[in-house]
Amino acid sequence: MTTSYMNGHVTEESDSGIKNLDLASPEEYPKHREMAVDCPGDLGTRMMPVRRSAQLERIRQQQEDMRRRREEEGKKQELDLNSSMRLKKLAQIPPKTGIDNPIFDTEEGIVLESPHYAVNILDVEDLFSSLKHIQHTLVDSQSQEDISLLLQLVQNRDFQNAFKIHNAVTVHMSKASPPFPLIANVQDLVQEVQTVLKPVHQKEGQELTALLNAPHIQALLLAHDKVAEQEMQLEPITDERVYESIGHYGGETVKIVRIEKARDIPLGATVRNEMDSVIISRIVKGGAAEKSGLLHEGDEVLEINGIEIRGKDVNEVFDLLSDMHGTLTFVLIPSQQIKPPPAKETVIHVKAHFDYDPSDDPYVPCRELGLSFQKGDILHVISQEDPNWWQAYREGDEDNQPLAGLVPGKSFQQQREAMKQTIEEDKEPEKSGKLWCAKKNKKKRKKVLYNANKNDDYDNEEILTYEEMSLYHQPANRKRPIILIGPQNCGQNELRQRLMNKEKDRFASAVPHTTRNRRDHEVAGRDYHFVSRQAFEADIAAGKFIEHGEFEKNLYGTSIDSVRQVINSGKICLLSLRTQSLKTLRNSDLKPYIIFIAPPSQERLRALLAKEGKNPKPEELREIIEKTREMEQNNGHYFDTAIVNSDLDKAYQELLRLINKLDTEPQWVPSTWLR
């Protein structure tokens, strides 16, 4: 995987962290020049590698063009030479007749036909004989002297060896170039054609389908793909060629790196341009580069498989490496950056509290490497070496995702979200109050960045990014309390009551506290804990209640100790709470499992309520849907899972399945719960 990485999109980095966060307008977003090479999926443009056969074809074409130019130049020179005194003198010599020049004897010479031109191959003896004939033809002293020099040159052993080499190269260059495959997967192309032809009932389409399905055609296509795959493989570079190329970089310290890269394993590196240089910017976890440990950030790439890289644009590097696999030979100038040996990084697991789409992020260093995720996803962060851009895998994708993806670092995400909020507040117009409505006193907030190190608890006012998680398997004798959350008329109370009625030995509710007087049929400790108002208010001040309220001048509430009593009895405590109670519950030691009961569509919700004899107004239904969105937006980071209650029976079965799964499978919980 090779991409380009442009620095300075968002920050100026220093040892102290981020100096500046510049959120530009969409028109001013930096232009991405990253081109993913060898990246999983169909990313970027692909170009066939240049093989030796194709190079020879181009060389041969260049030679043909040079030959034509030489002929044109020769004609011009001939006009000038005809005016010379020497040629005038030679023209006075009577022409000889009957001279047989072996140069033009095609029967003795080897004539090779080429797609471009015919080449005559002569021996040294033929050249020597031709010069002898010319020597007898020219009678002036200057010509005789010139011919004598040529005869001596032809008899020289070095010239004869060079002449043989010339003939050998000419023969090789004259051979027709072998065809180069356009694609190596013609079988896939034929399958696409067959898919297109399925609905076609015309005679020609059916004939083509039958022809493509014929065994001989199928065998031909298979043979084509096998040969094409071998043809498209680059020829390995020899040590001699590598060492010869090193000499071109005289005083520079270079190193040679060889990496074996399989077709299905990306290289896993990013590059950037610095002037004419191509510099390795980032090593991505999971790629061949990271596994080899031979490529490092800051190395300058001089050559890849004998092809010079210095001076190339990152797009050209993309084209070059798009289909390379096998042995890759890099000639590098090692980075001058002094870095401590990399410490063994521990993998941390985090729960995402926001949605992220790299295609909509103008600041991601490489969009092809960006990892998209949704609120509630578990991410396995394997590298925080770059504090702004972590490398991570999404839960469940480790086997299908060979390369780690880039996700925003925690502090980076917090800072830019804080900056966005500040900008939005500054742009928000001041609404003028009306005469019949009191103007709301808007509290002025100090514009400071959120410091994650000072507070790990989340408020609705705080910026939610990630929460570190750990796997937890509940003990058999200490069940996690089940909390049902949802808007009114969404069925959470009905689901809770059905569980209580059907499995009384397994589920129980916490006994609430109250300040009202006990009635005759009530039993203290079974129906309510009856306490004084003074004691109740003292417990509120001490934070002992999960939630509480006042009804008809009496206080009611559910305490943490009441829930703990149910857990200690070995039963599962069932609670239906308001969202305001979730933070207190999460900060306790009860380890709650919170399930959000969401309503179905507005029409389906109307039908469900009609079965219960309710006839809600359209505005009431819209209010329920809007309340659902509000609860998800403000408290969704507390939810472990959600159930859409489109059918009460199905919702009950799904709820029971989730509760049973807590006994058989470990679940992700905040790491602070286990410390």
Curated annotation (Swiss-Prot):
Q: Where is the composition biased (Basic and acidic residues)?
A: 54-79
Q: What is the effect of changing D38E?
A: No effect on interaction with PARD6B
Alphabetically list the UniProt keywords: ATP-binding, Cell junction, Cell membrane, Cell projection, Golgi apparatus, Membrane, Nucleotide-binding, Phosphoprotein, Repeat, SH3 domain, Tight junction
Effect of substituting H224N: Partially prevents interaction with LIN7C
Provide the positions where the record notes the PTM Phosphoserine: S14, S25, S83, S84
What is the documented disruption phenotype for this protein?
A: Conditional knockout in the retina results in mice which are viable, fertile, and morphologically normal apart from microphthalmia with severe defects in visual response. From 13.5 days post-conception (dpc) retinas show variable morphology, including retinal folding, variable thickness and disorganization. Postnatally the retinal lamina is thinner, and disorganized, with a shortening or absence of the inner and outer segments of photoreceptor cells.
The segment(s) forming the Guanylate kinase-like domain are: 479-660
Residue limits of the L27 domain?
120-177, 179-235
Query: Which residue intervals make up region (Interaction with PARD6B)?
Result: 21-140
Source organism, top-level taxon: Eukaryota
The SH3 domain, residue ranges: 345-417
Q: Which family does it belong to?
A: Belongs to the MAGUK family.
UniProt comment concerning the protein's domains: The L27 domain 1 functions in targeting to the tight junctions by binding to and stabilizing PATJ. The PDZ domain binds to the C-terminus of SC6A1.
Q: How does it assemble?
A: Heterodimer with MPP1. Forms a heterotrimeric complex composed of PALS1, LIN7B and PATJ; the N-terminal L27 domain of PALS1 interacts with the L27 domain of PATJ and the C-terminal L27 domain of PALS1 interacts with the L27 domain of LIN7B. Component of a complex composed of PALS1, CRB1 and MPP4. Component of a complex whose core is composed of ARHGAP17, AMOT, PALS1, PATJ and PARD3/PAR3. Component of a complex composed of PALS1, CRB1 and EPB41L5. Within the complex, interacts (via HOOK domain) with EPB41L5 (via FERM domain), and interacts with CRB1 (via intracellular domain).
- Protein's name according to its UniProt entry: Protein PALS1
Q: Which organism is it from?
A: Mus musculus (Mouse)
Classification from the root reads: Eukaryota, Metazoa, Chordata, Craniata, Vertebrata
Q: Which gene encodes it?
A: Pals1
